[in-house]
C-alpha cells in the first residue's frame, strides 16, 4: 500500500487557514489605512495543531499576533468575555470574540501593534517560539533551566569596559 499516513493536525491547519482568510479580508476592508498596520507583514496562521481535543495556533497579522483557538473549546458554562485555558506552560486568559465567517474564537494577545517586526520571517519565528514555550510544561527540565538565574554575577568593571568574559548559565 502506498500513500502517506493521515496528518492528525490537518483539520487544525485547515481551520487556521480559514481564520487567516477572514483576517486577510478584515485587513483589506478595515485595517490597512489605520496607523497600527505594519505594511511589511502579511496574515499567516502559524503552528496550528490539535491540542486537548481542540485546535490551537498563532495568528500573525500586520496589526497583532494572538494565540487563538475555537471558542467551542471553552466550556459552555463559561459566561463573560474571558476564559482561562490550561496549557502545559500554565493557565492562560483568553478573550472571546466573533470573527467573520468563522464565528466565535478565543484569543490571547501576544503583540499589538506589530512594528517591532521588520518582516514576516521575524514575526513567524517569534510566533513559533511563543507556541513552543506555551507547549513546554512549566515543571520540565528545560523550563526550569530557562528560569534559573546566571550562575555567576556580572563583574561591573568588565561590563563597563565591554569585556564580559564570565560564563553565563
UniProtKB/Swiss-Prot annotation:
Family indicated by similarity: Belongs to the HupJ family.
Protein name per the record: Hydrogenase expression/formation protein HupJ
Species: Bradyrhizobium diazoefficiens (strain JCM 10833 / BCRC 13528 / IAM 13628 / NBRC 14792 / USDA 110)
Gene that this sequence comes from: hupJ
Amino acid at each position: 500500500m502506498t500513500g502517506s499516513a493521515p496528518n492528525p493536525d490537518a483539520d487544525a491547519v485547515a481551520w487556521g487557514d480559514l481564520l487567516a482568510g477572514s483576517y486577510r479580508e478584515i485587513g483589506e476592508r478595515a485595517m490597512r489605512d489605520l496607523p497600527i498596520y505594519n505594511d511589511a507583514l502579511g496574515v499567516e496562521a502559524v503552528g496550528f495543531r490539535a491540542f486537548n481535543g481542540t485546535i490551537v495556533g498563532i495568528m500573525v497579522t500586520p496589526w497583532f499576533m494572538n494565540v487563538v483557538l475555537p471558542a467551542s473549546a471553552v466550556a459552555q458554562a463559561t459566561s463573560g468575555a474571558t476564559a482561562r485555558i490550561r496549557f502545559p506552560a500554565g493557565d492562560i486568559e483568553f478573550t472571546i470574540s466573533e470573527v467573520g465567517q468563522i464565528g466565535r474564537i478565543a484569543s490571547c494577545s501576544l503583540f499589538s501593534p506589530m512594528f517591532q517586526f521588520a518582516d514576516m520571517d521575524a514575526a513567524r519565528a517569534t510566533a513559533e517560539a511563543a507556541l513552543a514555550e506555551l507547549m513546554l510544561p512549566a515543571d520540565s527540565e528545560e523550563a526550569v533551566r530557562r528560569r534559573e538565574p546566571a550562575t555567576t554575577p556580572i563583574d561591573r568593571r568588565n561590563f563597563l569596559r565591554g569585556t564580559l568574559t564570565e560564563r553565563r548559565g
